[in-house]
Amino acid sequence: MDKNLHQPLGGNEMPRFGGIATMMRLPHVQSPAELDALDAAFVGVPLDIGTSLRSGTRFGPREIRAESVMIRPYNMATGAAPFDSLNVADIGDVAINTFNLLEAVRIIEQEYDRILGHGILPLTLGGDHTITLPILRAIKKKHGKVGLVHVDAHADVNDHMFGEKIAHGTTFRRAVEEDLLDCDRVVQIGLRAQGYTAEDFNWSRKQGFRVVQAEECWHKSLEPLMAEVREKVGGGPVYLSFDIDGIDPAWAPGTGTPEIGGLTTIQAMEIIRGCQGLDLIGCDLVEVSPPYDTTGNTSLLGANLLYEMLCVLPGVVRR
């Protein structure tokens, strides 16, 4: 292990309930020189003015960090040792405009231009799903069009919401229109519930996306599916966007638009672990809404899924 790599603060150095609540109790880094030294970073985007039902995900980054205090460095299931090979830190939150959604989107894109300019691979704590659009805009400038693994209860391909083109339910329609995605390398997993028409998921299919509805995932391991996903999206840079409402509300009630019949926490880990070997260039975990998360379990799940994302990044060694 490189002694110069940042390490999470251990439970014997500071009690788990003490200290500053950064993600995994990692150092908080902001200076240009420190940013240049990072390989990956956790960054919060506390935006929820793009939501259509229950707000509150502006508090998601803070609570995910608070629930991350029990996460330890080594992944005992997969052998991943991310802190042995990558320099990782928490670089704080994007200072969004909470009164103007379009201005907030502009600010997010600008901030991710800066983050990517330091050579950092971003692991984003949302925030509602609107935030993925400006992140993808910034990523295209660096990596070109990307493949996408998108876990969600909803396709987020509405043309508009109340006449607005930018909202958490329009993100991937805009991403296609702006040529941000390599549409033949996109998979959406966990889509479910009711639609306005019988063809609501077909727009995605017509673009070349593979759509895996939640019912196709019931009562089974998703390891075989993820082998197919790797075949579909591999061969170039890939972004992973994980909406917590992809998980059944029995496990993740703290979200803005819950839908029954969703994925399990085990399936969520299978999906993320199944991304190992892909050329991941960024990840996000969105739509955790702490006001509806009375036990903290949704934030705890979000924190652990972000750790699992860290564990499958390119360059992570296994012990």
From Swiss-Prot:
Superkingdom in the source lineage: Bacteria
Keyword set includes Flavoprotein: no
Catalytic activity from the UniProt record: 4-guanidinobutanoate + H2O = urea + 4-aminobutanoate
CDD domains with a match to the protein in the record: Agmatinase_PAH (cd11592)
Function, as annotated: Catalyzes specifically the hydrolysis of 4-guanidinobutanoate to 4-aminobutanoate and urea. Has no activity against arginine, agmatine, 3-guanidinopropionate and guanidinoacetate.
NCBIfam families: agmatinase (TIGR01230)
Record protein name field: Guanidinobutyrase
Organism annotation: Pseudomonas aeruginosa (strain ATCC 15692 / DSM 22644 / CIP 104116 / JCM 14847 / LMG 12228 / 1C / PRS 101 / PAO1)
